[in-house]
């Protein structure tokens, strides 16, 4: 076999359907859009959720709840992510951001207890879960709420 003899596998390449090229093509005249009407026009069609003038579902269903403007969103860090630091390192939100562990500090950093901590660290964060707090102290490290 030579390079010029290479061919695509049978059925792997489908020929593009060219519409409006004569009635015998099967997609001539109206090009598969049916007769007149909104959907036959260029740019035609209805917006998402439109139900033909009937009150749409999202307006028939009552509103519920509200968004609390005072909610705090914390950047979450798990224990196993802290293993990138050397023993005895003081881990602060700024250091976590520099290391690429958190993208933005948001309302502060919360340390969660997923994974296993293998280093002795001093961790400074806004919040700690009970399991994270216990694991850090068990490794001889310390925590500080800031």
Curated annotation (Swiss-Prot):
PANTHER family in alphabetical order = 50S RIBOSOMAL PROTEIN L15, LARGE RIBOSOMAL SUBUNIT PROTEIN UL15M
The UniProt entry, under PROSITE patterns, shows:
RIBOSOMAL_L15
As for what it does, the entry says: Binds to the 23S rRNA.
Write out the biased-composition intervals (Basic and acidic residues). 1-13
* Sorted UniProt keywords: Ribonucleoprotein, Ribosomal protein, RNA-binding, rRNA-binding
Classification via Pfam families:
Ribosomal_L27A (PF00828)
Q: How would you summarize the oligomeric state and partners of this protein?
A: Part of the 50S ribosomal subunit.
What name does the UniProt record give this protein? Large ribosomal subunit protein uL15
Q: Which gene encodes it?
A: rplO
């Amino acid at each position: 076999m030579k390079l010029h003899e290479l061919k695509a596998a049978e059925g792997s390449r489908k020929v593009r359907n060219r519409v409006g090229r004569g009635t015998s093509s099967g997609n001539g005249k109206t090009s598969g859009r049916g007769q007149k009407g909104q959907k036959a026009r260029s740019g035609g069609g209805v917006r998402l959720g439109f139900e033909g003038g009937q009150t749409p579902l999202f307006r028939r269903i009552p509103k519920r709840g509200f968004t609390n403007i005072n909610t705090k969103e914390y950047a979450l860090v798990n224990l196993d992510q802290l293993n990138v630091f050397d023993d005895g390192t003081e881990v602060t939100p700024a250091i976590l951001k520099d290391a690429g562990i958190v993208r933005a500090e948001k309302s502060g950093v919360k340390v969660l207890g997923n994974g296993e901590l293998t280093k002795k660290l001093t961790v400074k964060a806004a919040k700690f879960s009970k399991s994270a707090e216990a694991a850090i102290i068990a490794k001889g490290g310390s925590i500080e709420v800031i």
